[in-house]
């Protein structure tokens, strides 16, 4: 099967290598000419994922060349670039391939999920792939399980057959809204978990943040049409665990730096790659206001990131809120 992967960051590189191992004909598209020259000459993508890129994987900066005759096109760019790449795809598309989206985020200007953005430009079936999946582990063939979601279950089944092997297991879920929101909103909680670590707090604090974070993710998700059970699955609890606890998580690492006293700008500069949770915090905060949903952790992280609130004061605000029942609002 010919599969195109658009975006040569960590996840795009990892999924391209994984699919090449399965015997598919892979084309990896990128737009950065310097990165293109580096990969072509060294077969390494040093900035993002410094592993050998097999010679069988074609590398190109020509989008039309990349997607021509592809049966599946994987969008593996950051969430802020999904609209641009979708618009470009509309201009070059010549067949009804399945789109697989890997980006996890909510567009800040429109508050739309990534599949909604893609569908503005393409009539193709869109399959969302989400779950606990560090690229660094997938590329090393460490056992990983994720979830696929689409309005067309048949499209999910085609992707499931094409992507699965003994080290990469995929489940199907019909709840596109929940799967996308779980994958996006957990990055906010991971920033909070990192801030907690940076402040020197312990496991109790992180466990509380993760659990109460899941509660507010679920509240917003249900208000937007999700099945609450989705957030107990791989796109919810699964992704939340790995992103809040692993040092491979950019969101957690950025949070640690902020907890240690660095500004948001300094933290992002030190990470050197996209930290999706920052923009998602803006989007989720606005969604919570529009839908009148209580999201106290998101509110405090927003205040830390964009209003200069001291993290210790944010913790105090959370710990001294009015008394609640645990399942309030769910």
UniProtKB/Swiss-Prot annotation:
Gene3D superfamilies, A to Z? N-(1-d-carboxylethyl)-l-norvaline Dehydrogenase, domain 2 (1.10.1040.10), NAD(P)-binding Rossmann-like Domain (3.40.50.720)
Q: Where does NADPH bind?
A: 10-11, 31, 104, 135, 250, 274, 276
Pfam families, per database record: NAD_Gly3P_dh_C (PF07479), NAD_Gly3P_dh_N (PF01210)
Please give the SUPFAM superfamilies that the UniProt record associates with this protein.
6-phosphogluconate dehydrogenase C-terminal domain-like, NAD(P)-binding Rossmann-fold domains
Write out the annotated subcellular location.
Answer: Cytoplasm
Give the pathway annotation: Membrane lipid metabolism; glycerophospholipid metabolism
**One GO BP:** glycerol-3-phosphate biosynthetic process
Q: Which reaction does it catalyse?
A: sn-glycerol 3-phosphate + NAD(+) = dihydroxyacetone phosphate + NADH + H(+); sn-glycerol 3-phosphate + NADP(+) = dihydroxyacetone phosphate + NADPH + H(+)
**Predominant localisation class:** cytoplasm
- Residues annotated as the enzyme's active site: 186
InterPro entries tied to this protein: 6-PGluconate_DH-like_C_sf, 6PGD_dom2, G3P_DH_NAD-dep, G3P_DH_NAD-dep_C, G3P_DH_NAD-dep_N, NAD(P)-bd_dom_sf
Instruction: Provide the E.C. number(s) assigned to this enzyme.
Output: 1.1.1.94
Which keywords fit this entry according to its UniProt record? Cytoplasm, Lipid biosynthesis, Lipid metabolism, NAD, NADP, Nucleotide-binding, Oxidoreductase, Phospholipid biosynthesis, Phospholipid metabolism
GO MF, one example: NAD binding
Keyword hit for NAD: yes
| Residues the record lists as binding sn-glycerol 3-phosphate | 104, 131, 133, 186, 239, 249-251
Decide whether keyword Ubl conjugation is in the record: no
GO cellular component terms? cytosol
Protein family: Belongs to the NAD-dependent glycerol-3-phosphate dehydrogenase family.
NCBIfam families named among the record's database cross-references: PRK00094.1-2 (NF000940), PRK00094.1-3 (NF000941), PRK00094.1-4 (NF000942)
Q: What does this protein do?
A: Catalyzes the reduction of the glycolytic intermediate dihydroxyacetone phosphate (DHAP) to sn-glycerol 3-phosphate (G3P), the key precursor for phospholipid synthesis.
PANTHER family attached here?
GLYCEROL-3-PHOSPHATE DEHYDROGENASE (PTHR11728), GLYCEROL-3-PHOSPHATE DEHYDROGENASE [NAD(+)] 2, CHLOROPLASTIC (PTHR11728:SF1)
Tell me what this protein is called.
Glycerol-3-phosphate dehydrogenase [NAD(P)+]
| Gene from which this protein is expressed | gpsA
